Amino acid sequence: MTKFTINSENVKRLQTLSGQSKDLISLTKPIFCPSDGNLSVNLYSNRVTMSFSVDISAFETTDTGELNYFSMSIDEFNNTLATVSNGENDVLVEVDKDNNKVTFKNNTTGTKVSRAVYNAIVTLDEAKASVTAVDDMRDEYLKDPVTLKVTNEVSEFFETASKIMGLLKTQDAISLNGTSARYADQLVVINKTLSTSVSNTEVHLKRQLYEAIKPFLKITSELTVYLTPDFSIAFFESKDLGFKSILSLEKPKFAYPEDSDLEGALPQESSQVIVKTTKSALKDAFIPFNNTFKASPESWNWKKTDLDSSANNLAEGKWVLRYENYTGSAESVVPVTVVQNTEGANNGKLIVSIMVLEELLNIIPEDDLTITYNSLPSDTMYGALMKLDSDTVKACVTKYKP
């Protein structure tokens, strides 16, 4: 018989973590491993391994050690803790390997609840292997990791970033100069310099990564995210909660070279246009769109916005901001000053969502801004970089040839 006691404070933590884990990504199978005064919990799904440890106030076993490990479903464990303790009292846990069951007992009231062990008791070697899996994988894959520090201070920023990333992910067909083209996967990522440190991850930090980060921010003051150089796997770690997890990321359908950071993502010899304008001028340009389309917000699902940066327009010191959808069209002129234009007469149009521009303008502090976009040669698609003067916000958008 294996016995150990979880104090009330740690019961609350386990309830919180087990409840939150369901929001992270379908974590369904924990293994609890009482050993050396700690309770280690490992959660598994097809793509994620998550583990965290909780100090236990007492540990007693009559076993030799090889069968001190058992598994239950996360729902079953959480519900049992709630039934027996409600986080107010210590809980005694007894693992009966002979009868294949685990019993939770409230040490104050004596209330008992017994459960069958889910998926049978596992051996010491199997349990140890699962405990070290996260560290082993991190050591193997993170030779030169990309590190992202996320704190509660930047959670609001990630909310904005998620909206922008979600807006530009579409497979809808659009018409470009009489021809039909499809969005492969427009990526917009913003880096705001608060307590966030990002190197070459911008074009890869898609919505899936944000969605994985968001639940963690509810239960930890600081989260460290390590990404493999190819951005295929993300490792999450929280020191104050003591948990780690692994997330397998889908590779973007369109991305810049993996060995380049955002500033160097586009070749230096590529064409470049640098335009200066003001935030107020760009905001003023949105007025006709708001007036034209405010009666049919659902039409924003089929948006096409051109920042027409053709040579003639730039020569006249303007951008033409053009909006088209199934309900109509509208145009506005944005006064600009051309700082540099190496694209010449054949430069194309920058395709940017109006809502994305509005989101960008909402989070930059300065009125004057510089937008720089470089072209990445391709048969149908250019990459473009928008960099705002404050140096606190960067975005990567897709540009199409005319």
Regions found by a protein language model. Give the residues of each.
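DNA polymerase processivity clamps
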Residues: M1-A120, R138-P252, G264-P402
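Flexible hinge/switch segments at interdomain interfaces of large molecular machines
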Residues: K253-D259
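Long, charge-dense
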Residues: V122-Y141
